[in-house]
Swiss-Prot record:
Stored InterPro entries: DNA_helicase_Holl-junc_RuvA_I, Hlx-hairpin-Hlx_DNA-bd_motif, NA-bd_OB-fold, RuvA, RuvA_2-like, RuvA_C, RuvA_C_sf
Protein name as catalogued: Holliday junction branch migration complex subunit RuvA
Annotated compartments: Cytoplasm
Free-text note regarding domains: Has three domains with a flexible linker between the domains II and III and assumes an 'L' shape. Domain III is highly mobile and contacts RuvB.
A GO cellular component annotation in the UniProt record: Holliday junction resolvase complex
Organism: Campylobacter jejuni subsp. doylei (strain ATCC BAA-1458 / RM4099 / 269.97)
Top-level taxon in the UniProt lineage: Bacteria
Its biological purpose: The RuvA-RuvB-RuvC complex processes Holliday junction (HJ) DNA during genetic recombination and DNA repair, while the RuvA-RuvB complex plays an important role in the rescue of blocked DNA replication forks via replication fork reversal (RFR). RuvA specifically binds to HJ cruciform DNA, conferring on it an open structure. The RuvB hexamer acts as an ATP-dependent pump, pulling dsDNA into and through the RuvAB complex. HJ branch migration allows RuvC to scan DNA until it finds its consensus sequence, where it cleaves and resolves the cruciform DNA.
Keywords: Cytoplasm, DNA damage, DNA recombination, DNA repair, DNA-binding
Family as reported in the entry's similarity comment: Belongs to the RuvA family.
Chain positions covered by the region annotation Domain III: 139-183
Length: 183
């Protein structure tokens, strides 16, 4: 099983890239639009991989952010949601919008995603509603950074928005990056 790939991006389409590794092997990886916006060709990146093997295919789905990968994998557990639909959700909703829709039971947010109708939106809300507490604990670093920035007087909505797009890892790095964007 492949769980990570690091290499130079040699080809980039909106939701598909080819990564050439140091070993000389190149891998085709499906990515979300959010991930695509953060990368360029000829850059070196490391991707968290979810590998899906079927009798007629072996596909890699790549993520720069472990939280987005967890969201993708949770969506795959929903009855009737496949990899394409899960990736459409990852491309349409940032992780905080997704969590908020789940916690509020807001089907209308999910219905805006291409390929998700009323029945699928309801099924996602129902089947993942009990996992909300797990989702809240996905990134302890982001939670700690949120708490620290709140004590500094910043608005929660702005903080969440900034942290959702943050590249840094670790609480202190997240806070530094957020402070630059919030000022």
């Amino acid at each position: 099983m492949v769980v990570g790939i690091e290499g130079i991006i040699t080809k980039k389409e909106p939701t598909f890239i080819i990564v050439k590794c140091a070993s000389g092997l190149s891998y085709g990886i499906f990515i979300s639009l959010f991930c695509s916006a953060k990368i360029q060709t000829q850059e070196k990146h490391e991707f968290f991989i979810t590998q899906i093997i079927k009798e007629d295919s072996n596909k890699f789905y790549g993520f720069l952010d472990k939280d987005e990968q967890k969201m993708f994998e949770m969506l795959l557990k929903v009855n009737g949601v496949g990899a394409n639909t899960a990736m459409a959700v990852c491309s349409s909703l940032d992780i905080n919008s997704f969590y908020k829709a789940l916690s509020l039971g807001d089907e209308s947010v999910l219905k805006k995603v291409p390929g998700i109708g009323p029945k699928s939106a309801k099924r996602i809300i129902v089947e993942l509603s009990d996992t909300r507490t797990k989702l809240e604990n996905v990134s302890d670093d982001k939670s700690e950074a949120l708490a620290a920035l709140l004590t500094l007087g910043f608005k929660q909505e702005k903080i969440i928005s900034v942290l959702a797009s943050a590249q840094a890892t670790g609480t202190s790095e997240l806070i530094k990056e957020a402070l630059k964007k919030l000022r």
